[in-house]
């Protein structure tokens, strides 16, 4: 593994110096190549699907794993979108002149080698490779073994493009070891790897966070909340809540707990129940919720659970303070929303809720790099350092200081 990582590190020194025009050209060629090789990728994907079915993997996981012409086209389009983004490398963030004549510039630079650990979605392979490349980084990717054949096919297509352009193919690499031991070895290699981004289940995140010698930006669970304030537009609150739960229930920005102000519970809960049941959502409520609608009783465990399914917990709260306290206790720092027509209540919620993305009168489903205008994303960070929220190419850079002098010495 050290030899693989050494080559990736060497490649990162080349990618760091590429200008935006070259990077855009390569990304467009990578997009073309994915589409031209779609039959090959689909054939390899069938091997992964066979493994998934033989090992009784969940329907949701198999859906994330599945590739067809349309999905490969979307992967190619994502690379084209990345190619349209402004190159962050070399951008001057700040600059000033000292009294002694030294001119200082704070300039964006690539991080170096980024290790990304993720599970069954092969589209992450091309997205991550594209984002890392556009931001001047090299990447070492560790996908799940259930997507092994698909990932190898995708990476080989991308590497061929680099080679044809006389660039180091190792700038886009797969970790050769798919085992947990392979992950452990990767996260010990702080000599070669500059940042680790784990995307996946709670156990994976915990394992990486506790064992890594390399700095980690976590993409942890999304235990998202919507609080329906006493001054909410009821119809809007129902519409937003249904969207946040059912549009894609298996993703990290779907809502898991609904907090309802006590003063509007009788008006809103029956409407919520009717609309959620139309969508096949199982509701679980606190004692006060059960006084209004007949649903399953929620337990303490429910407030801590990211369902990733058509299940929603409902808690009636006394006021804004209790809603915020609940989010502070059980939230994961991902995305939380308030539905209200009251400006001061919305500002208090925005300022006090300490999550990466805090909304007013909108669905939590918008927490996404594409929706935010970042192009694709490598994930959604629940860290406070080094990046937070959807991570686009800007978040895959750091900075250095360039100091221009004309003979100054320190007295």
Swiss-Prot record:
SUPFAM superfamilies given in the database record: ALDH-like
Record-linked InterPro entries: Ald_DH/histidinol_DH, Ald_DH_C, Ald_DH_N, Aldehyde_DH_dom, G-glutamylP_reductase_CS, Glu-5-SA_DH, GPR_dom
Enzyme Commission number(s) from the entry: 1.2.1.41
Pfam families tied to this protein: Aldedh
Subcellular location: Cytoplasm
Any single GO BP term: L-proline biosynthetic process
Function: Catalyzes the NADPH-dependent reduction of L-glutamate 5-phosphate into L-glutamate 5-semialdehyde and phosphate. The product spontaneously undergoes cyclization to form 1-pyrroline-5-carboxylate.
Entry-linked NCBIfam families: PRK00197.1, proA
Protein name: Gamma-glutamyl phosphate reductase
Organism, scientific name: Nautilia profundicola (strain ATCC BAA-1463 / DSM 18972 / AmH)
Taxonomic classification: Bacteria, Pseudomonadati, Campylobacterota, Epsilonproteobacteria, Nautiliales
Gene encoding the protein: proA
